[in-house]
UniProtKB/Swiss-Prot annotation:
The keyword Amino-acid biosynthesis does not apply. It comes from Encephalitozoon cuniculi (strain GB-M1) (Microsporidian parasite). It comes from the Eukaryota. It is found in: Nucleus. This is Probable serine/threonine-protein kinase KIN28 homolog. Component of the TFIIH holo complex.
Length: 308
């Protein structure tokens, strides 16, 4: 049996508490508060919260474990171990120092165009590793994009992942990063929901604040339609048949140029392709990685020179 020393608490999510830990000399239990380290490499220990109704939390843990066992990529956080202790599932992951939300919110950090290009390319490569295995992440946001001390991206928090082709709930993805088809109640969706989320993260790297920060689903849709235009059947066949479709105010189709004056034409083109309302027309991850934006000047900032 492997034993881990659990040290300080790192953070807390919807269904788990995360602690800093280290491998220790084996004892009669997998988790201890003190002991002798056998490795100085830290790990993140994710303890699934105990509740009276644990089934939902356990399902999330199982989804995360299954997905991470399948994905082998330097752009995705690595699964190290799993165990049950004190009636709680624990997931041991590689420890990563910070996340993209912290970087974006840190006003002392200057984010240059090459930095944005490097980070969003790594995010896309991580998402591609999911999509090629027919896994939808369903919760891409800056807080779930971990950043190493060198600036390397690691996608994390796979508790909402599902396989492409399953009929699903629309209540996935944090609202600010949720695709319009989800906001309108679609249960028949796929990998394009992740691409919308990537677009929102891309925009946030330029703006340093969330692009669409609605307090309700209706307000969220209104903000999206104000910026991108209200969808019509001609451009998005079937939109009016979605379960939560309403007779929304008609806003004209607009360009993002005014909001992103510092973005290059290639960056704007990729952003508009990611934030396409009709999911059938939204750019795929593979095509996004091949977009001319990543070949244009300036080049992506090298690992080790990113502002972390």
């Amino acid at each position: 049996m492997k034993t881990y020393i659990r040290e300080r608490r790192l953070g807390e999510g919807t269904y788990a508490v995360i602690y800093l830990g280290y491998r220790a000399l084996p004892q009669d239990k997998p988790l201890v508060s003190s002991g002798t380290r056998i490795e100085d490499v830290p790990v993140a220990i994710k303890k699934i919260k105990p509740t009276k109704y644990t089934q939902g939390h356990e399902i999330s843990a199982i989804r995360e474990i299954k997905s991470l066992k399948r994905i082998d990529s330097k752009y995705v956080v690595r699964l190290i171990d799993t165990f049950v202790y004190d009636k709680c599932v624990h997931i041991v992951l590689e420890y990563v120092e910070t996340n993209l939300e912290n970087v974006i919110r840190n006003s002392d950090k200057i984010i240059m165009p090459g930095d944005i290009k490097a980070w969003i390319l790594m995010v896309l490569r991580g998402v591609y590793e999911c999509h090629r295995l027919f896994i939808i992440h369903r919760d891409i946001k800056p807080n779930n994009i971990l950043i190493t001390s060198e600036g390397m991206v690691k996608l994390a928090d796979f508790g909402l992942t599902r396989g492409i082709g399953n009929r699903m709930t629309p209540q996935a993805v944090t609202r600010w990063y949720r695709a319009p088809e989800l906001l309108m109640g679609s249960r028949d969706y796929g990998s394009p929901v992740d691409m919308w989320s990537v677009g929102c993260v891309f925009a946030e790297l330029f703006l340093r604040v969330p692009l669409f920060a609605g307090d309700t689903d209706i307000q969220q849709l209104d903000m999206i339609f104000r910026a991108l235009g209200t969808p019509v059947e001609r451009e998005w066949p079937g939109v009016s048949t979605l379960p939560e479709f309403l007779d929304f105010q008609q806003y004209p189709k607009a360009s993002l140029n005014g909001l992103f004056s510092a973005a290059s034409s290639d960056a704007l083109d990729l952003l508009e392709k990611l934030l396409t309302l009709n999911p059938c027309n939204r750019i795929s991850c593979d095509d996004a990685i091949k977009h001319p934006y990543f070949k244009s000047s300036p080049p992506p900032t090298p690992i080790g020179k990113l502002p972390v």
